Amino acid sequence: MVELVPTLLRQELARLAEDNLRLDGRGQWEGREVTLETDCLYNAEGSAKVVMGDTIVYAGVKFEIRTPWPDRPAQGSLMCGAELRPVAHRKYEPGPPSPQSIELGRVVDRGIRESGCIDMESLCIVPGEKVWGVMIDIHVLSDGGNIFDACGLAAIAALRTATVPAERFDVGEDYTLKVN
């Protein structure tokens, strides 16, 4: 017996492909509309909100002074975490971080590291003793697609607006984080 829903879905997808349309009505090569707002989180040292179609993402940057990793005594550190909560989409569940949220954080983290947009040595305060730890927190409020793109954009925009709070930690004057 043929299952009705998969057959109807397959027929609808075939019709959309023939008409060069996507499920949401956009053309085959048409992207989602993107808006970007920065400095939108009061308690973060840098922040951004990205709206990409129906996807809404916030990213915030915080700094802390840490002991450097033994194999990189003159380099700061970067940590990126992502939250996918049930409010974003019905497929997400409450509780500890899901494999999807862990992977999302890792992908954004790796993209920032591998791009070299932050000079990790510029985050050194005292070699072998003190470095800046950069923490990026990403919160997906609505997942309408393209969350990897939206999260990456939000993280980079938040970094570009971040001020290193050196005065608060008594290690100099505040300065804008340099992002290439």
Name each model-derived stretch.
Residues 1-180:
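Polyanion-binding surfaces on beta-sheet-dominated domains and ring/shell assemblies
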